[in-house]
UniProtKB/Swiss-Prot annotation:
Keywords linked to the UniProt accession: ATP-binding, Cytoplasm, Magnesium, Metal-binding, Nucleotide-binding, One-carbon metabolism, Potassium, Transferase
Binding site for Mg(2+): D16
Descriptive protein name: S-adenosylmethionine synthase
Gene: metK
Quaternary structure note: Homotetramer; dimer of dimers.
Length: 430
């Protein structure tokens, strides 16, 4: 008997993701001007208002208000009717200095013995069901919203689109855990009130709402989904699309009020969207707004890097890696591996974990250096998932009236590189 599995994603205009992107934009600017910055930046967004709070230790000085407004503008909240607009929203800051107690407990004379910024457990996961070693349901959910955002920015078709949106994809698997078909796709997108009722009656309003919904549903199926399918270059995934897919498009009906005006957004409230869509596991720590001394972020990236390279090397078809830390202690307390019975080596999961411990240095400073995490690389991670993205080298320019302008070349999504495959194959005799 097969089973159904579902993952969701949210767009860059979802209020929680607006908050994530602002927090990571603050982090990036501080790292651009002072790579040693210690940052924990939390953001709240609501009707006409942004509130920044958190702890920072840095030599840099940045304009927090300008950073927030630039992010909001880039996302697309540029009209007063959204009740949250880049030029007019208020921006309040309650950011203060990092606790010296924490700082003393983490920093060491030998940088390589830098302690973990907090206790906790972090997970990395990978599966070979997609080319980017991500769960298919989440990969498709992200893709749908990325294409929807492209359509919105082009302003050629579906011109009624607003920034807030969500998607959900349900995949049917067979008994062996192989995807066999796409069962259900849910798309909810914020939109303009683009059809006005003939009069003030409830009947006229209902008719106008139904006409809008009919157009949006048609456009999602006839414009959005063909572009999503065209962006997929994997024959096995393309074969999963079928005429029996159930589409739920704006199933609650009218969706004009949205974004931070519709729901308050907070940093760190989409941790499953950020990672594996419900597959694998999650230690509970959010990523955005945190510099890499916080193992919530850096160790989760390192665990993904390990799991992806292990699966790509052929050690297993699917792998979960857990690593845990004590605050102020450099070396992890444990490394745990689960191959879900899909290993291709004659070793127990515990034995595989011991080989991983020999191959990968999981001290926080070693992770920072291996994955180049002391660079301004984080705003790009804050929408459409931190995992499964394409590593790339980009040039980023930062503007500051206080520090001057600065251009840096950085490598994004380094934890997605398959740069340990050969070492792993040698270690496991593959």
């Amino acid at each position: 008997m097969g089973y159904l599995f579902t993952s969701e994603s949210v767009s860059e205009g979802h209020p929680d993701k607006v908050a994530d992107q602002i927090s990571d934009a603050v982090l990036d600017k501080l790292l651009a001007y002072d790579p040693s910055s210690k940052v924990a930046c939390e953001t709240l967004v609501t009707t006409g208002q942004v509130v920044l709070a958190g702890e920072v230790k840095t030599k840099a000085y940045v304009d927090l208000q300008l950073i927030a407004r630039e992010v909001i503008k880039k996302i697309g909240y540029t009209k007063g009717e959204y009740m949250f607009e880049s030029n007019s929203c208020g921006v309040l800051s309650a950011i203060h200095e990092q606790s010296p107690d924490i700082n003393r407990g983490v920093e060491r004379q030998d940088p390589m013995e830098q302690g973990a910024g907090d206790q906790g457990m972090m997970f990395g996961y990978a599966t070979n069901e997609t080319e980017n070693y991500m769960p298919l349901s989440l990969d498709l959910a992200h893709r749908i919203l990325q294409v929807l955002a492209d359509i919105r920015r082009e302003e050629k078709v579906m011109t009624y689109l607003r920034p807030d949106a969500k998607s959900q994809v349900t995949i049917e698997y067979d008994d062996n855990g192989t995807p066999v078909r796409i069962d259900t796709i849910v798309v909810s997108t914020q939109h303009d009130d683009f059809i006005q009722p003939a009069d003030d009656s409830a009947e006229a309003q209902l008719k106008a709402d139904e006409e809008m919904l009919s157009i949006i549903r048609r456009d999602v199926i006839e414009i959005l989904m063909p572009r999503v399918i065209a962006s997929i270059h994997h024959d096995k995934v393309l074969a999963l699309f079928n005429d029996q897919i159930v589409y739920h498009v704006n199933p609650t009906g009218k969706f004009v009020i949205g974004g931070p005006h519709g729901d308050t957004g907070l940093t760190g409230r989409k941790i499953i969207v950020d990672t594996y869509g419900g597959k694998g596991a999650h230690g509970g720590g959010a990523f955005s707004g945190k510099d890499p001394s916080k193992v919530d972020r850096s160790a989760a990236y390192a665990a993904r890097h390990i799991a992806k390279n292990m699966v790509a090397a052929g050690v297993a078809d699917e792998m979960l890696v857990q690593v845990s830390y004590a605050i102020g202690v450099a070396r992890p307390i444990n490394i745990f591996v689960d191959t879900y019975g899909r290993s291709h080596v004659n070793m127990t999961d515990g034995e595989i974990a011991r080989v991983i411990d020999q191959l990968f240095d999981l001290r926080p400073k070693a992770i920072e250096e291996r994955l180049k995490l002391r660079n301004p690389i984080y705003q790009e991670t804050a929408a459409y998932g931190h995992m499964g993205r394409e590593p790339q080298v980009v040039s980023k320019t930062f503007f500051s009236r206080y520090e001057g302008n600065k251009t840096v070349e950085v490598e994004l999504f380094t934890w997605e590189k398959l740069d340990y495959v050969d070492k792993i194959k040698a270690a496991f005799g593959l």
